[in-house]
Amino acid sequence: MSKQVPLEIESVTNIQNLRNFLARYEKEVFCCIELPAVHSAYWFANRGQFKELLSLDAKLTASPALQCFSEESLYVGRQHLRMLKPMYDQRMLQRFRKCVINGEAKGWNPIVFGVFLSIHSVPIREGLLQFGRQTWSGFINGIKDKKGFLESECLELLDHYVDRLPRWIENVVVESNTSPGTLKANFR
């Protein structure tokens, strides 16, 4: 059995490569790691489960499937954390930020996003939909600008993935209802 080629956005040179990349990303990272991680972070933040939040951060850090996306995810997560500065009176956020500054946590985007949803009392389905839209839009529009892909082809791809979000979100939420409070992400 041959080993799977690493998932790298840099290898995308045409629209078909982009389709293939997005299909793999959806299957290997987005649906089984990122969406469940946002949901778990939301759950942990709602319940004040700080140790579990740090454990989730460590598991994301150790996940080989996320390594090629770590720079971007950490950058976005830390930027989001900085934008939440006016909310540092929130104990969970304050503690997590301190751990990121001290190097005890990395500050992955799905975790910061989940905490953000919890602090702002955003309903989880709505929040996961927002996370998904931002993720797909970031990938597709970012590569479109870099590679000069046609707007119409990229818009079609974006619509395709955004239209699929409700099903994936429902899978995450329904699965979590069967065993509340447990980590849902399938780390690889």
Regions found by a protein language model. Give the residues of each.
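Hydrophobic alpha-helix position signal
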Residues: 2-8, 84, 117, 143-144
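Glycine/small-residue-rich interface belts in oligomeric ring/scaffold proteins
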Residues: 1-50
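Inter-helical turn/loop segments and adjacent helix faces that build the functional surface
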Residues: 8-16, 87, 91-95, 119-127, ...
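Short secondary-structure junctions and interdomain/linker hinges
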Residues: 29-33, 45, 67, 87, ...
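A contiguous pocket-lining binding segment that forms or flanks enzyme active sites
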Residues: 98-150
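Electropositive phosphate-/nucleotide-binding environments in soluble metabolic enzymes
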Residues: 12, 16, 32, 67-70, ...
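C-terminal auxiliary extensions adjacent to catalytic cores
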Residues: 131-188
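Internal, conserved structured core segments that host functional sites
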Residues: 35-43, 47-120
